[in-house]
UniProtKB/Swiss-Prot annotation:
The lineage of its organism: Bacteria, Pseudomonadati, Aquificota, Aquificia, Aquificales. One of its GO terms (cellular component) is membrane. It comes from the Bacteria. InterPro entries: Cell_synthase_bac (IPR018513), Multihaem_cyt_sf (IPR036280). Residues 1-18 form the signal peptide. Keywords: Signal. It holds the Pfam family BcsB. This is Uncharacterized protein aq_2175. GO terms for biological process: UDP-alpha-D-glucose metabolic process.
Amino acid sequence: MKKMKKLLLLLSASFAFSLQMDFKEVKKFPYIKYVTAWKGTPAETKDVAVPNVYIVVGQKESPEVLTSAAKVAFYLGQWTDGIGLSPKLVKEGKIPKLIISDKEVEKYKDRNLIVIGTNNEIVRELGLKFKEPTLKVVEKDGRKILIVGGKDTKEVVKAASFLADRVISFKVGAYNTFFNWVRVRGMIEHGNYEGAYDMLTDSRGVHACGRNMSLAAPMMAKFPPEVKKVVKKRNKIMYVELPKALKEENKEKAKKLWREAMITCFQCHHGIGIPKMRKFEPLADIHSKHQRIANKYGLSCKDCHYGITEYRGYEEGTTEQ
């Protein structure tokens, strides 16, 4: 608990305001899910990321709160591949919604909720009161609800901005980087050096990590020296040495460098030789997509998870399959 409080203060410091936040619950909130999308077209595809939430605002909320809801929707849209369209839904005029009013909640029961603001029926039914900008997770009627609150409009906007800019946006960069990093390994395995180089340097590929490095910069300055050393090593490999090896079409060197960079990621995420920087275990159903990506290239878990990176798993009772 003490560690969580310290991290929250550090996160909030860069925004110059205090924030009450259910850290683990907000980080692990089921924002998205994977589905088979575009059914009924030749492009029908599995593992498509779509929203797993409705963003709810009260019918009488202020324009500032409505704008904040749009900002959260913008970053959620960057994380997903689409809204879950199909010719059937379009023909029926049932294009899926993302933002709904508090009066529509009972009509749309198939997703979790992000409720932005306090002038709505959900907050009133829960009897919630807020003294400061707040991100709070509750459960009601069998689904998770992330409440974005505050004692006034200004504080609600601050909490919503934190959710959009620091939580969802960070996940966008993290998962784009992670999944494309696995694709780079697969391309190296098959000698597709140009494809690997392009994936490594693309802004939506591995370079998507630049978003996270920007967001983490205020915290990075306060990291212990041993953590900074590991991050510096990772950056040199990912952005200097590995691109060079790919240009040289040196397969063994590229695989070795990829492996070394993976180890640095494990050090930060699992606390190997340095303090553990990731304070929660990721959701298995979201994170484990990387296994299916690796499988498409003919790679198995053991091709990457061995030795110091042998650990594979998530929460207690769940493991990668």
